[in-house]
A protein has these predicted regions:
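A short, conserved, highly charged catalytic patch centered on acidic carboxylates
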Residues: 2-114, 130-185
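Short beta-alpha junction loops
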Residues: 119-124
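Conserved blade-register residue in beta-propeller folds
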Residues: 126-128
């Protein structure tokens, strides 16, 4: 009798915990969608990019030595047939996604996408992928469309060093597995 009661209490606690986890996941997903919408509005209204230049949730095929996988990002801005910047939105710590955006920008094209940004809507880090440096810490420091067009004029497609390519692909692939939303949409 005591064992049955303990088992019933354990199952009830499990149910409560699972409901709480699901609720928190739904809140995080809603926050992420809010960040993505805010970034889209910023790109269009403040930065003056055209909607047709911004790819939303694009997927890229990644060929590793032993498998092939699809990886994605929130936004890619393409100018003059060149992927100019990748943008990853986060509902929590942007630091945890810095490595992903850098690896992603280095490996999804046959050249390094020159810029990457990760943001939670408040904070941001903007990276120059070729030099490896941080060039901005706010979404407001992101290039406006005309500045981006000026930068792309002299852009030379530089592939990532082949001896480091597999490692970067594996980093992008590993992050892809952990970024899936936990809540079914």
């Amino acid at each position: 009798m005591i064992n049955e009661r303990n088992e019933a209490q354990r199952k009830e606690r499990e149910k409560i915990v699972m409901e709480k986890v699901k609720e928190e996941e739904m809140i995080a997903q809603a926050q992420l969608e809010g960040v993505k919408e805010w970034v889209w509005d910023l790109l269009i209204t403040e930065k003056k990019f055209r909607p047709e230049e911004i790819k939303i949730d694009p997927q890229f095929s990644l060929k590793l030595s032993d498998c092939e996988a699809m990886v994605g990002i929130d936004y890619v801005i393409n100018l003059n047939s060149i992927s100019f910047i990748v943008i990853k939105c986060s509902s929590s710590s942007i630091e945890s996604w810095e490595r992903y955006v850098k690896a992603f920008a280095r490996v999804v094209q046959n050249y390094q996408i020159p810029y990457a940004m990760v943001t939670d809507g408040e904070n941001a880090k903007i990276f120059d992928i070729i030099s490896g440096s941080v060039i901005g810490i706010s979404v407001h420091e992101l290039f406006k469309r005309q500045e981006a067009l000026d930068k792309i004029k002299d852009f030379i497609k530089i592939p990532f060093p082949p001896e480091k390519l597999e490692r970067e692909k594996r980093i992008a692939y590993a992050f892809e597995g952990i970024k899936c939303p936990a809540v079914k949409q």
